[in-house]
Amino acid sequence: MAKKPDTSSRIADNKKAAYNYFFEERYEAGLVLHGWEVKALREGKVQLTDGYVIIKDGELFLIGCQINPLKTASTHVSPDAARIKKLLMHKDEIRRLIGKVEQKGYTLVPLNLHWKDGRAKCEIALAKGKAEHDKRDTIKEREGKREVERVMKSRHR
């Protein structure tokens, strides 16, 4: 049987999250969006860098995610770029997250936005904040990898 083509594609990544947090678990959540937001996502007018997820009354909300409206947005709708977006997940997953987030030091951060079967999805992670020395270790590790790649590249020439 033929394999179905991969219809998912990345809209935006939160690269700063990997620098600031250790990821424990990853989850995928749906997004409740307005029409102008979907159009802006298709154009890639989104910023996740300062985003975070809160749990309020047993529901998940994405805060700090900027979806900038297109210049051609409708005139009868006043778009709010910093609007709080509701995330959709199963109740049992949300209950599990509530228990883990209540532990000291854990938070929920958005990792990326992507399309899956024509719908916008947000990948979120249960994360623990890195200390300053951990961030320095991450930088050293990244620079070490770059140096190895540079040496290997020069050897192959």
From Swiss-Prot:
| Major location category of this protein | cytoplasm
Its domain of life reads Bacteria
Q: Which GO terms describe its cellular component?
A: cytosol
Provide a Gene Ontology MF annotation, just one.
RNA binding
| The keyword Aminoacyl-tRNA synthetase appears for this protein | no
Protein localization: Cytoplasm
Q: Does the keyword RNA-binding apply?
A: yes
Xref: PANTHER family: SSRA-BINDING PROTEIN, TMRNA-BINDING COMPONENT OF TRANS-TRANSLATION TAGGING COMPLEX
Q: Which HAMAP family match?
A: SmpB
Q: What is this protein called?
A: SsrA-binding protein
- The gene name reads smpB
